[in-house]
Amino acid sequence: MGRGVRVLLLLSLLHCAGGSEGRKTWRRRGQQPPPPPRTEAAPAAGQPVESFPLDFTAVEGNMDSFMAQVKSLAQSLYPCSAQQLNEDLRLHLLLNTSVTCNDGSPAGYYLKESRGSRRWLLFLEGGWYCFNRENCDSRYDTMRRLMSSRDWPRTRTGTGILSSQPEENPYWWNANMVFIPYCSSDVWSGASSKSEKNEYAFMGALIIQEVVRELLGRGLSGAKVLLLAGSSAGGTGVLLNVDRVAEQLEKLGYPAIQVRGLADSGWFLDNKQYRHTDCVDTITCAPTEAIRRGIRYWNGVVPERCRRQFQEGEEWNCFFGYKVYPTLRCPVFVVQWLFDEAQLTVDNVHLTGQPVQEGLRLYIQNLGRELRHTLKDVPASFAPACLSHEIIIRSHWTDVQVKGTSLPRALHCWDRSLHDSHKASKTPLKGCPVHLVDSCPWPHCNPSCPTVRDQFTGQEMNVAQFLMHMGFDMQTVAQPQGLEPSELLGMLSNGS
């Protein structure tokens, strides 16, 4: 066992033993306790105690082995604190009841505090949007939980990056976790209240601001890092709000809190639909037209630096990741499936279980190529060539890899590269990649992709079965790889 791990083990055992009531004092009988150090005041009762920092400088040459030992150590020590730890996130409705969901009920958040940590993770839920009275009425009838807090449960269990289990969440399990339910239907951009004129309130941007304000009184004021994360509409919400959160904290007197973003499945393209349809509802409306209508209906706000890039009335451009990202000051890690199911849906691509015709197959392949191109200048990105949607709060989020690196590992590398800095490092850490974009050109060519099931039979399909189901000619696929079709099929069937 390396010196770094031995030291960590000793400190952790002392920390674990010292956290129990009736603490033992290890000194000879009659010996007086040593005086407290003069350089730092002891923390007041009830205040969080900072975790021991790790010095990685001595173990850079064998970081993977070191982190494997640390993870094993964390898992073995976890039970010593888990007995007193409630894993559930508890609901808190906002004290400022003027900041509401669509129907006027108070917005809120779920919180699980971790008193030994100065890292805070705020997660924005996703769930599409509505952009006029008719489809908002329909949404209220069918998806009321996404427009009202009246039936929210008192607690919820964190999964994926919100999990408090180190085996499911190896690097963030001990952070302060905040889940912010999506009840504004405005991609977290709205700033209009309910009134006689407006049947619904759209206050997504204001909800985030108010949650941050309340959390300052619950320990966020002592944070070192705030990671604003989100999936789908929540991922787009991260891009729209991360700089605003940093500016808010600075104005309130907390400039030292490092604000970062993690946008999952919210990096959409304003591309041409496969089949153009009239804009009658959320699903069939082209992305550009839906957002153009929505931003007016919601009184939506976008990042100021992005807004200045476009003429008045063209602010909708800032909802698209590749346009807003270059204007952001805060570092953002982008997670995006190259063949995102929500993107395909708004592009009117519907995979019905029938073999895909050549025109559609080429459209899907080109979509992956376009998305890959938009990520070429995003230094921190994870883009598997999979047909899926959302990942970071899925329990299987540790399974998917790009070029041999998992998403939690990539996020950890990114975290290290940003240590004590608000700017991305120019030189990536050796053996710790953060720009991970698949280069293979068809859906599910990455064998670690989530399982696909046949829509009619419900049976799982391996990669080879899925590609043939999609209508891919295996001869055409195998030839550029220098393989025979039978060899490629064998490799894909075995998960190679």
Curated annotation (Swiss-Prot):
Glycosylation sites: 96
Highest taxon, organism lineage: Eukaryota
EC numbers on record: 3.1.1.98
Key words of the record: Glycoprotein, Hydrolase, Phosphoprotein, Secreted, Serine esterase, Signal, Wnt signaling pathway
Cellular localisation: Secreted
Enzyme class: hydrolase
Modified sites of kind Phosphoserine: 81
GO biological process, one term: bone development
Gene Ontology CC annotation, any one: extracellular region
Tissues expressed in: Rarely expressed in adult normal tissues.
GO MF terms, alphabetically ordered: palmitoleyl hydrolase activity; phospholipase C activity; protein-containing complex destabilizing activity
Signal peptide coordinates: 1-19
Active site residues of this protein: 232, 340, 389
Reaction catalysed by this enzyme: [Wnt protein]-O-(9Z)-hexadecenoyl-L-serine + H2O = [Wnt protein]-L-serine + (9Z)-hexadecenoate + H(+)
Function field: Carboxylesterase that acts as a key negative regulator of the Wnt signaling pathway by specifically mediating depalmitoleoylation of WNT proteins. Serine palmitoleoylation of WNT proteins is required for efficient binding to frizzled receptors.
PANTHER family: NOTUM-RELATED (PTHR21562), PALMITOLEOYL-PROTEIN CARBOXYLESTERASE NOTUM (PTHR21562:SF7)
Protein name: Palmitoleoyl-protein carboxylesterase NOTUM
Native source species: Homo sapiens (Human)
Highest classification ranks of the organism: Eukaryota, Metazoa, Chordata, Craniata, Vertebrata
